Amino acid sequence: MITEGTMSTDTRSRTWTLPGLEVTEVTLPVPLDHEDDTSARLELFARIYADPEGTDRPYLVYLQGGPGSEAPRSVGPDSPPWLARALREHRVIMLDQRGTGRSTPVGPDVALPEGAIDGAATLREATPAQQAQYLTHFRADAIVRDAELLREHLGVDTWSLLGQSFGGFTTLRYLSAAAASVETALFTGGIPSLGPDMESVYRTTWEGMAARSERHWARFPGDRDRMRVLVDRAEAGRLRLPGGQKVGVERLRRIGMLLGRSQGQEQLHHLLGLDPDSPAFAHDLAGALPFGGRNPIYAVIHESCWADGTVTDWAAERAMPGTVREDPTLLAGEHVHRELFTEDPELQVWAEAAELLAQHPWPRLYDEDALRAADVPGAAAVYYDDAYVPREYSMATAALLPRLRTWVTSEYEHGGLRSSGQGVLDHLLDLAKGRREA
């Protein structure tokens, strides 16, 4: 059954059902620039999932990892796997963060909101400087202000947050800027460092990925030779994706992203075991490369999520150790590099904007005094060997939050919220509510 209605001017709602779920969709206007009352308006989209027996339960907002990825699309109570556990105590809001999904997505040929950029109907038509300026409005600070408008629209004083990866960064910004609106804060693999020293964070992640690479080669010794064959092909311009697109050495190195996932070693082993001339290999390689045209925000302003009052200046490239630079079998993880924007035809449109954004002076995201004063209960899953968000930085930041309880575990990789089924969320809800000690 579907019912539709209008909740206020320019705001739309629709309610429908899935087996075991009641689904309400909400769309409302939000300013592109929250500091400008005359700013162009984006559309903000969210789906609210409820157990049919619990349509009055408090809200839990899921903040997706990324940046640049939309919220999951549920097809039932177990999709994603943790949803059923959340619905026992909450209604769950799946928020498409601005620029993703149905929230005025960023793309070269997507129609821009009226008045967003003078003289341009799409970002492809805009100058690189205009593209860059537009994209400065898609960080966690703006996402939090969007969420606050949604909260006010729904008429609730407080709600709880569940932040996965970059969603945890956004949750921390929420506690810094609007802690009074937060009932409970849950983090999974997503507590960032504070301050401008991005290079040290990336240096740590490079060292971690080098160690993961060596562990993989030790477990599957033949894989290193297969990787060297691929490196030789890449250097010769003979490594290609299904459409004929060339893959260079640095882009190839990013298949190391697999090593930060559950069963990632096995996935990498299977990929390297394929005949490099086969269609299967070309397609699977394309699927394993982390940065691409589907979610351009993830590539173009990725490093800005770590920028707490600094310029990024290609921090991951600058922090790459010499030993890694000299050995292409030491793989990369979530490390953006310039060649992405020349090799990938879908990212070429963003190349000049990416250079400009790398020199943009990003404002601070976090206020340490506000975090120390945040009287909000919470719990965090900190993964001991997290490939993307180093544990030591997460723990230092967590120590600022007076009511946050941390659970350090080596049982899961960065995506433990999903791979654990209901396990990680169940643990955090109990920890935050005082139903367990650790």
What residue spans do the PLM features occupy?
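Short alpha-helix in the alpha/beta-hydrolase fold that links the catalytic acid
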Residues: L271-G273, P390-A399
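Short beta-strand/loop motif that positions the catalytic acidic residue
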Residues: A374, A379-V382
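Short, Lys/Arg-enriched N-terminal segments with co-localized hydrophobic residues
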Residues: M1-T6
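Conserved alpha/beta-hydrolase "acid-adjacent" motif
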Residues: G264-Q267, D386-Y393
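Core-facing hydrophobic residues within beta-strands of well-ordered domains
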Residues: V182, L401-L404
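Gly/Pro-rich cap/lid or specificity-loop segments adjacent to the active site
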Residues: S8-P242, Q348, L365, D369-A370, ...
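A structural signal for short secondary-structure junctions
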Residues: L371-D375, Y388-V389, A398-L400
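Alpha/beta-hydrolase fold active-site neighborhood
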Residues: G237-P363
